[in-house]
Structure formats: C-alpha cells, structure tokens
Curated annotation (Swiss-Prot):
Keywords: Amino-acid biosynthesis, Aromatic amino acid biosynthesis, NADP, Oxidoreductase. GO terms for molecular function: shikimate 3-dehydrogenase (NADP+) activity. This is Shikimate dehydrogenase (NADP(+)). NADP(+) binds at residues 129-133, 221, 242. The keyword S-adenosyl-L-methionine does not apply. Pathway: Metabolic intermediate biosynthesis; chorismate biosynthesis; chorismate from D-erythrose 4-phosphate and phosphoenolpyruvate: step 4/7. Involved in the biosynthesis of the chorismate, which leads to the biosynthesis of aromatic amino acids. Catalyzes the reversible NADPH linked reduction of 3-dehydroshikimate (DHSA) to yield shikimate (SA). It comes from the Bacteria. Shikimate binds at residues 19-21, 66, 91, 106, 223. It holds the Pfam family SDH_C. It is an enzyme of class 1 (oxidoreductase). Homodimer.
C-alpha cells in the first residue's frame, strides 16, 4: 500500500514507457519489505535539468537515468563515483541534502557479464555507438583488456569517446572505426557490443545487417527480441541480452539506494513474467 511515508524512486528517459525497470525494482522492494514505489518518468531532452530539480523537490530518494539523459545527468550531479567520472555518464542517482550523487552501474554490469561470457584480454572488440550506454561498455571493455574499436554514425562522437576514455583509463587501447566499414569490423572482432538505441520503441534507424559466428560474444543493450539479438542467436554466438544488463545494473542501483543486497533472482523473474504476459 502506498502511503504518505512511501519512498519515491523512478526512471527518467525519453522515451520511457517501454521501460521494465518499474516491474523489476518494485518486485525487489516487495521482496525485502521496503516501503517504496518506483515509477517511469517521461522527460524530454530539453527538460532534464528542471526534471532533476523537480524530482529532488518532490522528495524522490533515487533515480535511474536512461536514453538520452545519462551524460547530462552526470554533469548535474554534485558528486560522481569514479566510474561515472571516467565514463562521463550517470545512470543511477542517489539523493543528498542539496542535490544528487551520481553513479554508473551500467559499466560494472557490462564488465561482469562480458567476463562471464568469456571475453579475454587481448581480444578485439567492436563497440557500436558513442552515447551513455556505449561509454559504459567502452569502460568495461577497456577494464577487460580488449582492443576497442568504436564506430558511430557521427565520427566526431566516436573520436571524443576514445579521447575521453583514454585520458581516464591509463593504457586503454581505443580507436575510432569507420561506420561505413561496420560489417568488416564486426567480422574481425571477437566481441561486438551494440551501445546504440536502435531497436528501442520510438527510435528510428537500423544497423547494417551483421553476420556473427559461434565464437563471438555479442552484447545488445536494447532488450527484447531485437534484430541483432536474433542474428546472434541464429549464429550460435554467446549473447549477452539487454535484459541481463538491465537486471545486473538495476541490482547494483538497488544496493546504492537501500544499502541492502538486491534480490536479483526476483528482479529477473519480474522481467520474465512481463515478457510471458506479452
């Protein structure tokens, strides 16, 4: 039951109606008996500054941040954890007296999942995209010791990501790749990561069709039955799904907000239940 004492949490994004975070986080609160509610908050890009101020004024205790707000959210926080600082994007905010502390849970979630999928030091990785999710994936790939090639439709965005991460992480091996050569780059890579919003509801555009092989690891930040995920499964590649990333980063966010270990299995089941009801 929601009362006057119920703590408020939410996710801000544009679009955000598709988000599965409310089911997942509310399942976690219910499992541990936390008096809290988590809601989706649609926020247009030009209104993110006032939205974060307003959420703080309304008493929200924590927020997740999704497309396209992660880089801007980081710049609006009073303090950032080391990973969010290195990545230049924040996807988890925790309330302080005067504002928000920012964290990046996408990056450690990616690292854990990619390592579990068998990514090894010295392997070559293709990262598609240069936004907040791609920056988190770049950090994870660098931490795992891979040679990262970044391809984005805007070449300057890919180059900027490479410069920023190279400055933040000594010894990082990053270079921009030509988006027009995406198919060849994917063929040469042991790891392929989609850090774009292609496949999200409301986002136009497609990636060129990529051919995968069984030895590759493929991570798609976008959850659901995406074209990329279908191609990876058909080829027998080791797929890290958007749902896996969502659960892992969401569990880390839950712990940041509550100080309690997240009931990750319950969170995953909540996503599966929604998928089964569709």
């Amino acid at each position: 039951m929601i009362t006057g004492r119920t703590a408020l949490y939410g996710v801000v994004g544009h679009p955000v109606a598709h988000s599965r975070s409310p089911e997942m986080q509310n399942a976690a609160f219910a499992r541990l008996g936390v008096d809290a509610v988590y809601v989706a908050l649609p926020v247009a890009p030009e209104r993110i500054d006032e939205a974060l101020r307003g959420a703080h004024a309304l008493g929200f205790q924590g927020l997740n941040v999704t497309v396209p707000h992660k880089p801007r959210a980081a710049s609006l926080c009073h303090a950032l954890d080391p990973v969010a600082t290195a990545v230049g994007a924040a996807n988890t905010l925790r309330r302080t007296r005067d504002g928000w502390d920012g964290f990046n849970t996408d990056a450690p979630a990616c690292r854990t999942l990619l390592e579990a999928a068998g990514v090894v030091r010295g392997s070559r990785a293709l990262l598609v995209g240069a936004g907040g999710a791609a920056r988190a994936a770049a950090w994870a790939l660098v931490q795992l010791g891979t040679e990262v090639r970044v391809a984005a439709r805007r070449e300057e965005a890919a180059a900027e990501l490479c410069r920023d991460l190279a400055a933040a992480v000594p010894g990082a091996d990053l270079a921009a790749a030509d988006f027009e050569d995406l198919e060849a780059e994917a063929d040469a890579a042991a790891v392929v990561v989609n850090g774009t919003s292609v496949g999200l509801p409301g986002h136009e555009g497609r990636l060129p069709p990529l051919r995968f092989r069984a030895a590759q690891v493929v991570l798609d930040f976008v959850y659901g039955d995406t074209e990329l995920a279908r191609a990876a499964r058909a080829a027998g590649a080791r797929l890290v799904s958007g749902e896996q990333v969502l659960v892992r980063q969401g569990a880390l966010a839950f712990t940041i907000w509550t100080g309690q270990p997240a009931p990750e299995a319950d969170m995953a089941r909540a996503l599966e239940a929604r998928e089964g009801a569709r």
